[in-house]
Regions:
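Peripheral, non-catalytic segments flanking oxidoreductase cores
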Residues: 1-255
Length: 255
């Protein structure tokens, strides 16, 4: 079952002076949906469009050139069908998507996990059971999503309900789609929702650029005291952020 979902739109035109009412709107969105839009974030539409153009240029390169940047230590190119974000799917074929992951450009993380880049200047009909990205929740803390306007993103707000109810999330020009990840759900003891989502094919190519905000690998993640009580004890054991992310990636690529 699929319907359209109206998500909250959060205006952060004055990020240094975010009011208590804006903070309450963000909290409400994290509690109820795990998804919301952010507009007036200070990033120009021209830059957003340029990033999408560069993404398209890279993925239009010949396969052998992209394979020369094949993923190492989680960073680099991931070819078509290499990922299966929903390990429960019985099909042996992975998701119908390509990815290119890169991380920090400076500091200790950049030295520990070096990025892979193409040479400078080089980047210039669907089956009903094929997924652009199968049903999953994101691994980390917070995700910011920029899309090219092509539809396909759907969310399921109640993952325990059967049959699942999928709701379309359209893009809004100039806005980012923001969603909560599993690590934030762990930290808040399930208070903030890491919502199940997927991308369905619509008969045309779809490009998106995603920013994943994650803790440092040695960060100790455990349920916050303020999110626990006698009636709501910690639901998740403590874990290092790096160990958690690596295990989630292992399941994605080995399933």
């Amino acid at each position: 079952m699929e319907t359209s979902l109206v998500l909250p739109i959060i205006d952060i035109s004055s990020p240094d002076k975010i009011s208590s009412s804006t903070a309450k709107l963000i909290r409400k969105a994290c509690l109820e949906h795990g998804f919301f839009y952010v507009k007036n974030h200070g990033i120009s539409e021209e830059l957003m469009e340029e990033v999408l153009r560069e993404s398209k240029s890279f993925f239009n390169l010949p396969l052998d050139e992209k394979m020369s940047l094949l993923r190492r230590d989680l960073l680099g190119y991931t070819p078509l069908h290499a990922e299966k974000l929903d390990p429960s799917l019985t099909s042996s074929t992975g998701d119908s998507k390509e990815s290119f992951y890169f991380g920090s450009l400076e500091g200790a993380l950049a030295q520990r996990y070096p990025n892979q880049w193409p040479p400078e200047g080089e980047v210039i009909s669907w089956d009903v059971e094929t997924y652009g990205a199968s049903a999953h929740s994101d691994y980390g803390m917070v995700t910011l999503l920029l899309t090219d306007g092509v539809p396909g993103l759907q969310v399921c707000r109640d993952k325990s309900r059967q049959p699942r109810v999928w709701e379309d999330v359209p893009g809004i020009r100039g806005a980012f789609i923001v969603n909560i990840g599993d690590m934030m759900e762990r930290w808040t003891n399930g208070l903030f929702r890491s919502t199940l989502h997927r991308v369905m094919p619509v008969g045309k190519e779809r490009y998106s650029v995603v920013f994943f905000l994650d803790p440092n690998p040695d960060c100790h993640v455990e349920c916050l005291e303020s999110c626990c009580s006698e009636t709501s004890p910690p639901r998740f054991p403590p874990i290092l952020a790096g160990d958690y992310i690596k295990e989630r990636f292992r399941l994605t690529y080995e399933s």
